[in-house]
Amino acid sequence: MINTETFDTHTPMMQQYLRLKAQHPDILLFYRMGDFYELFYDDAKKAAKLLDISLTKRGQSAGNPIPMAGVPHHAVENYLAKLVQLGESVAICEQIGDPATSKGPVERKVVRIVTPGTVTDEALLQERQDNLLAAIWHDNQGFGYATLDVTSGRFQISEMIELETIAAELQRSRPVELLYPESFEHMALIENFHGLRRRPLWEFELDTAKQQLNLQFGTRDLVGFGVDKATLALRAAGCLLQYVKDTQRTALPHIRGITMERQQDTVIMDAATRRNLELTQNLSGSTDNTLASVLDLCVTPMGSRMLKRWLHAPVRDRQILENRQQAIATLQEIGLELQPFLLQIGDLERVLARLALRSARPRDLARMRHAFQQLPDIHQVMDSSDSPYIKQLQKNIGRFDELQELLEKAIVETPPVLIRDGGVIAPGYNSELDEWRTLADGASNYLEQLEIREREKLGLDTLKVGFNGVHGYYIQVSRGQSHLVPIHYVRRQTLKNAERYIIPELKEYEDKVLTSKGKSLAIEKALYEELFDLLLPHLAELQTSAEALAELDVLANLAERAETLNYICPTLSDKPGIQITGGRHPVVEQVLREPFISNPLSLSSQRRLLIITGPNMGGKSTYMRQAALITLLAYIGSFVPAEKAVIGPVDRIFTRVGASDDLASGRSTFMVEMTETANILHNATEQSLVLMDEIGRGTSTYDGLSLAWACAENLANRIKAMTLFATHYFELTTLPEKLEGVVNIHLDAVEHGDTIAFMHSVQEGAASKSYGLAVASLAGVPREVIKRARQKLKELESLSNHATASHVDTPQLALLTEETSPAVEALENLNPDSLTPRQALEWIYRLKDMV
């Protein structure tokens, strides 16, 4: 913390720094000094650690050196990118005054604030991932949640009651920056997120939020958006919008509306399901061998981002799904023609966001122009389709011939990175600019003529005319001939072997050229800003076009994937159940070297719960996951890896597949397993698809079997959910005899001596035996251990069979029975009523010895 008592002891420049820093106490301040951005005090220490840069010292504060660190201005974007990825925010303070005319420190001002959730610069963004800013609110009515993608203007809200539901939503949206009220009671829910920002309660005030939102959208109320009753979510949305306005410090015309996400509109998946199905991230945290890695060959970044949104929010609206199916079928014929043109569109969505924020760079406008140039070819290909949905997309894409012509006239073919570099506006666009440029560009001819004239007039063969950034134009003569220069040559600089002079004629020309360069750059900047004014009135149509182009890219990509990977169009049915013929796992079939064995799946009202048995490594988990992934693909409108698929109504997908210790939360494997199981039993419905893999294996045999049995009963009898229930408890294979709608299936395998061949083929009925020893042998367990295990297995099986035979009528299922103790046998044969007190005492000692 900076001591205000010592403020007057600082230099004027440091006083200026301290005033600016006081306005931004919680974030890093990049303070421009010449060619560097400097940081001081705790900011310097933090930046030195995070960026691995040198920590130095400058001046003194209360007798102690001031810590300082700095980064060069030309490389600032790289350092900002690193800080943003670490969840840090940075205030950028620039010199806005002229050092030449400033009395005291040059005037400085914070011109932008870079935060993880509000960045729009392409160098700071992951191009194929959404960059979401979020806000969360909680009170006794539930949770309100709002997300905004500043790079597209997509603004969404939702409301939830249960903690599990908001946890799943946070997992799905994965915001890079999260705003929460200072009174928030569920910190455990959000503590693992980067970019947490604690905000005062008044920023979540409901009336202020409504006022802010109406002001942003130019509306009197929020009824038209269907969000006026969502008071919890509106509190979060109001805080979020205010935060963006504070950081961007400019209008936000690309944020034109807000939508309410309702749970009944999508197939709900909790955090565990998203993780287990490896949609966009595998269990190791990378993107390899995920569903997205197989499906996403989109040619535009905005298409790739849209596809990932679809995967994480499958829709239940039949009309939307059938529109997509119809479009994919059409694009199988014309999609390959479209993709080369779509490839040239680039990331139009994010270019438009930068245009809206008036931060678009010259190359952004060139990219926009290039995108417009592709539209006639895209329309020509789409004209050949008679699909109503393709026609609707074509209408939304539109044409921007006038804007294309404007940018072709205004911007050079290959513009520089920044407008301050000049040379952005094309020749012929503005006559005044052309005149000033001609004056500046004519300098080289004039200087050549002056050099020839002066050299001949004075007879000095070493004379030459030049320019440098410090001293401007000069006439240079060697030291040996310097005594021959005329009196009107005024010395400007002395070098080791030469003298440099200025003459009135050259000075006059210098003033004119420098004026012309400054003037032409000023005109260019004004014309560039004017281009924004000409483009921004079309922002709404441009955003609609970008969204339609992104969707066209997704659909063309899914058409190519369907054609290449042999996917078929699933039938969406109102009848409960899932019927799949020749189903395949979309990811596993791509990474396997040998052919993938396809399998059927049949779930219906009469066949609700499948008990799946078979060897470890036999393919149970793959089979279960493939059922969920095929269902999910059908609910994003995609074709699916199968010979035939009929998919009935599905409201949720649950998975209880595999588990590991959650050490961070202090939960064991079994606790994780039971928490996920409890979530399923509380929230699954008759229309849910439930995958349960090896329930109860994390505890003792009796406990585990009892829990697995009770869970299966509950799912089959009470919930009646469509369930795939894999188990190693063979006792559960008797359930079909006791419960309606329960069926046994198994994954086949064939044993050859000590080896095993997995057939990966699903068959009706229970597995005939376990293959644990064969799998152990395959894993390399020593031969003598396998041999001993085989002997022990025979002993245990004979004991188990004997116990089963002698207790045929007992309801308890036979497990691995232990040999009866001699003490137990003695007690069974003992008649306590015939014993004297002394004999009873002797028997106690005798039984103790037996034990």
UniProtKB/Swiss-Prot annotation:
Membrane spanning residue stretches: none
Gene Ontology biological process terms, A to Z: mismatch repair
Any Pfam family the entry gives: MutS_I
Chain sites annotated for binding ATP: G614, P615, N616, M617, G618, G619, K620, S621
Keyword ATP-binding: yes
One example GO MF annotation: ATP-dependent DNA damage sensor activity
CDD domains: ABC_MutS1
Designated name of the protein: DNA mismatch repair protein MutS
Origin organism lineage: Bacteria, Pseudomonadati, Pseudomonadota, Gammaproteobacteria, Enterobacterales
Gene for this chain: mutS
